[in-house]
Amino acid sequence: MPGEQQAEEEEEEEMQEEMVLLVKGEEEEGEEKYEVVKLKIPVDNKEVASQMPAPSADPARPHACPDCGRAFARRSTLAKHARTHTGERPFACTECGRCFSQKSALTKHGRTHTGERPYQCPECDKRFSAASNLRQHRRRHTGEKPYACAHCGRRFAQSSNYAQHLRVHTGEKPYACPDCGRAFGGSSCLARHRRTHTGERPYACADCGTRFAQSSALAKHRRVHTGEKPHRCAVCGRRFGHRSNLAEHARTHTGERPYPCTECGRRFRLSSHFIRHRRAHMRRRLYICAGCGRDFKLPASATAATPTERCPECEGS
């Protein structure tokens, strides 16, 4: 197993390559300790910063970054950190040519080619290629959620999930769809959205072969085969496979009819009933003129019982 120093270097690279996010109580060797130090998400090789703190006056960390103010105990650590601003990536993989800003990151990346997984979970024996991945995995066993949102108090086990959640409060959406321009707060949300353009359906049902673009859609579909109905009505106890079906059913108890018809004022409990009703209005009010062949509608005051076979233009000629 790699030494403790190598594990610390890989954890530092994990933060610098993918996300720089320190929460109060966490501290890496030689780095300033902040409640929220910095959030760095790769968006077209640009940096997105959030809640940038003022540097500490701690004499134990005299080397401050001129770009963001973060302080370090060693000049060499500052030099490594500076690459997050300059974009310099001097360490190249001999297998695929991919470049990295830290040597430890190249070492960790090399395991994707060799298949080496030196970090093993003592709980379930699952193995990982990076110490940080093992540390995140172990929180599934311990239930630890060290990342707390200062806005709503919600806690997260992974810094990446916490960073994405913060954008709910800030409104930041750095991931834009190249096809339609729609922006998203997380890369995973963008990846799911892009399937609406590509038509990709990577999730297949093992029972019937039906494919889905979203894993959540597959999970819902599976209930057709398993008969699972996890959503229970609190009033009558009836169970449903989908939350939307439960919401529609609940209106039989509350009497709510949220879909009003603008033509006649009648209200409906289900959207499907409302749509069917609207089509009935359209059929009654749409006619083909016997004179010119164009379709036309009757005035709102007219009824289906007194239609005319000619449009107003032909009728007046």
From Swiss-Prot:
Does this UniProt record's set of keywords contain DNA damage?
no
Kindly list the GO molecular function terms attached to this UniProt entry.
Answer: sequence-specific double-stranded DNA binding; zinc ion binding
- Where is it found, in Gene Ontology cellular component terms? nucleolus; nucleoplasm
In which family does this protein belong, per the annotation?
A: Belongs to the krueppel C2H2-type zinc-finger protein family.
ZnF endpoints (C2H2-type)? 63-85, 91-113, 119-141, 147-169, 175-197, 203-225, 231-253, 259-281
Instruction: List where in the cell it is found.
Output: Nucleus
What keywords are annotated for this sequence in UniProt? DNA-binding, Isopeptide bond, Metal-binding, Nucleus, Repeat, Transcription, Transcription regulation, Ubl conjugation, Zinc, Zinc-finger
Q: What is this protein called?
A: Zinc finger protein 771
> Can you name the source organism?
Mus musculus
Is Ion transport among the key words of this record?
A: no
The covalently linked position for Glycyl lysine isopeptide (Lys-Gly) (interchain with G-Cter in SUMO2), per the record, is: K33
| Source domain of life | Eukaryota
The role this protein plays is: May be involved in transcriptional regulation.
